[in-house]
Amino acid sequence: MAGGIELAKKAIRSLKNYDEHENRYGSIFSVSGPVVVAANMLGCSMYELVRVGHEELVGEVIRIHQDKCTIQVYEETSGLTVGDPVQRTGKPLSVELGPGLAETIYDGIQRPLKQIFDKSQSIYIPRGINTESLNREHKWDFTPNKDLRIGDHVSGGDVFGSVFENSLFNDHKIMLPPRARGTVTYIAEAGSYHVDEKLLEVEFNGKKHSFSMLHTWPVRAARPVADNLTANQPLLTGQRVLDALYPCVQGGTTAIPGAFGCGKTVISQSLSKYSNSDLIVYVGCGERGNEMAEVLMDFPELTIDINGKPEPIMKRTTLVANTSNMPVAAREASIYTGITLAEYYRDQGKNVSMMADSTSRWAEALREISGRLAEMPADSGYPAYLGAKLASFYERAGRARCLGSPDREGTVSIVGAVSPPGGDFSDPVTSATLGIVQVFWGLDKKLAQRKHFPSINTSLSYSKYINALQPWYEERVPGFNTLRDQIKQIIQQEDSMLEIIQLVGKSALSETDKVTLDIAGIIKNDFLQQNGYSDYDRCCPLYKTYHMMRNMIAYYTKAKSAVETGSVPWSKIKESTSDIFYELTSMKFENPNEGEKEIVEHYETLHKKIEDKFHTLTE
C-alpha cells in the first residue's frame, strides 16, 4: 500500500515537472520584421527574456494579450516560421556586472564582440550565439574587506572585497547586490578567483545565499541609491567653449543636437578622451560602424599620465556598439545596457560619463517598433510616449550617495548626441530632449561649413548649471565667472553690430564698437575655435582657458578705456600694440605638455606687458 502511494506521488511530481516544462514553451503565431507574436504564452510577464525559434534568438516581451504576447527580437528574424518554439526564461533582460567590464566592447545586449569573433571567426555576429558577458576563464586577485567578520550583518551595496582590474581602475569594489541582505556565514580569503566562484555566503530567514564577484541587474530598472545629492562639481571637457561658456556638472544631462557633419561625434569622443571622469561608457547607438572603429583604433594609443607613467585611456572605457547595420530592436536595448553599466560604476563611488551617440537613432528604432505594433503615431510618426521614454533615460543621471558601507558618492553624467534631419531643431526628438536636459550645446551647420570647430552656436546654446558652479569656480579660479560674463557680453554685442555693418559699413561704428568688434574676432577665431587634431589644442586645461580669457579681457578693458577718454583712436592703439595683438592670437599654441608652471609664467608675462604698454600709451 505504502509503495503504491509513493509511486503515485512520484507520478504526480513528474507530471508537474512535465507541465512546467511545457508551460515554458509557446509557439510563433506571426512574424513582422523584428516583431514576433507568440501563442500559448500564459504566465509570461512584461519585459521577460525569451528565446525565439530553433536558433534561440534573443527577444523581449513588450505586450501581452490573453495567451498571446508580442516580442521584439534583438537579432535578424529571417527564416523564422509559424509554429517554431518560443522558450521563456522567467527573467528580464539583464546585464552581468563585475570585474572585466572595462576595456571591453559589447553589442546592444551585452554580448562581448571579441569573444564572439574568436568563437565564430566571422566579422558578423552569428544568429543565436550565446556567450558569457564576463570572462569566466580569467582569474582576478580578490582582497576581502578587512572589517568584515563572520556573524556580521550585511545589506545591499555593502562592499565585501575589492579587485585590481587595471592601472586606471585599480579598486574595483565587489558589492552585495542592492536587494540582498543577511548574516555572514562565510567569506573567502585573499587569492585569485574566477568571477563566478563563491566569495561570500549569507544567511537570511534560515536560507543561505552565495555571492560571487558578479551579479546581474535588469537593464530597465534604475539601480537604487541611498540619497540623491545636488551636483556641484564641473565636468571639465578640455574644450574651451564648453568649459568657459556652457559648463556641465558631474551628474548632469547634456544634449548635442546638430546636422550631419557638424562634429557631434568628435565632441563626444573628445569628452571620452579628455574629460575629468573616472570611467567612460560610450554607446554607439545606430551610428556608422566606422565611428566605433575609429574609437577602437584611437583610444588604445591615447594616454594619460598616472604617477608619471602613460596609460591608454581604453583602460577606463567600456564600449557598447550597436551600429546602423545591426538589428533595429537592439538599439533600444543598447541605451539601457549602457546606462546600467554606468550606474554600476557610480555605485563604486566613481564619476562616470555616458555618451549616447545618437539618441535620434534610438528614437527611430522606437518609431519602427511602434509602427509594427500598430500604435497610434504622434508627431512625425514617433510614438506618443517618446518624451516619457527619453525622460526616464535622462533621469538616471545625477550625483548620489551610494547604498551600503563604506560611505561613497558617485555621479553619472549623460551626454546625448541628437541628429535632427536637416539640422532642424524643431524635430520631435530634439524638442523632447530640450525639455529634459539642463545643458544645450547647439551645433551650427554654417560654422561647420566655415571649418569653425567645435561648431557651437553661442546664441543658441545655454547651461542651467552656471549658478550651481559659481562657488566652485570662485574658490579655485577667482574671477572666472566675471570673465565669462564679459566674454558673453562681447559676443552678443558683436552679433548686434554685424547687422549695422551690413547696412552702413564698418566706418560708421564708434571707436569703442571697433574695439569690441576686433576683440570679438580674437575670441571667436582664437579662443572658441579649437583644433582637435593638434597636440597643443586638442585638450585645453582649465588654467590655460582662464589665463587666455584674462589676457583678452585685460587688453579689451584697457583699449576700451583708452578710446573712451578720447586721447588715442583705436587704429593707433592697434598699430602700436600689434605685437601684443599677435601674441593674443597665438596664446592657444602653448602646449600643456610643457607643464602648468611654464605656461602660466608665459601668460603672466603677457598680462604685465599689456598693462605696461597701455600705461605708456595713455601717459
UniProtKB/Swiss-Prot annotation:
Q: Which reaction does it catalyse?
A: ATP + H2O + 4 H(+)(in) = ADP + phosphate + 5 H(+)(out)
MF terms per GO, please? ATP binding; ATP hydrolysis activity; proton-transporting ATPase activity, rotational mechanism
Q: Name one GO biological process term.
A: intracellular lysine homeostasis
InterPro entries recorded: ATP-synt_VA_C, ATP-synth_a_Xtn, ATP_synth_asu-like_sf, ATPase_a/bsu_AS, ATPase_F1/V1/A1_a/bsu_N, ATPase_F1/V1/A1_a/bsu_N_sf, ATPase_F1/V1/A1_a/bsu_nucl-bd, ATPase_F1/V1_b/a_C
Superkingdom is Eukaryota
Q: What does UniProt give as GO cellular component?
A: fungal-type vacuole membrane; vacuolar proton-transporting V-type ATPase, V1 domain
Cross-referenced Pfam families: ATP-synt_ab, ATP-synt_ab_N, ATP-synt_ab_Xtn, ATP-synt_VA_C
Keywords, A to Z, come to:
ATP-binding, Hydrogen ion transport, Ion transport, Membrane, Nucleotide-binding, Translocase, Transport, Vacuole
Question: What's the Enzyme Commission number for this chain?
Answer: 7.1.2.2
- So where does ATP get bound? 258-265
Q: How does it sit in the membrane?
A: Peripheral membrane protein
Q: What class of enzyme is it?
A: translocase
Q: What is its main location?
A: membrane
Q: What are the subcellular locations of this protein?
A: Vacuole membrane
Free-text function comment from the UniProt entry: Catalytic subunit of the V1 complex of vacuolar(H+)-ATPase (V-ATPase), a multisubunit enzyme composed of a peripheral complex (V1) that hydrolyzes ATP and a membrane integral complex (V0) that translocates protons. V-ATPase is responsible for acidifying and maintaining the pH of intracellular compartments.
Per UniProt, subunit arrangement is: V-ATPase is a heteromultimeric enzyme composed of a peripheral catalytic V1 complex (components A to H) attached to an integral membrane V0 proton pore complex (components: a, c, c', c'', d, e, f and VOA1).
Family in the record:
Belongs to the ATPase alpha/beta chains family.
| Name of the molecule in the record | V-type proton ATPase catalytic subunit A
Species per Swiss-Prot/TrEMBL record: Schizosaccharomyces pombe (strain 972 / ATCC 24843) (Fission yeast)
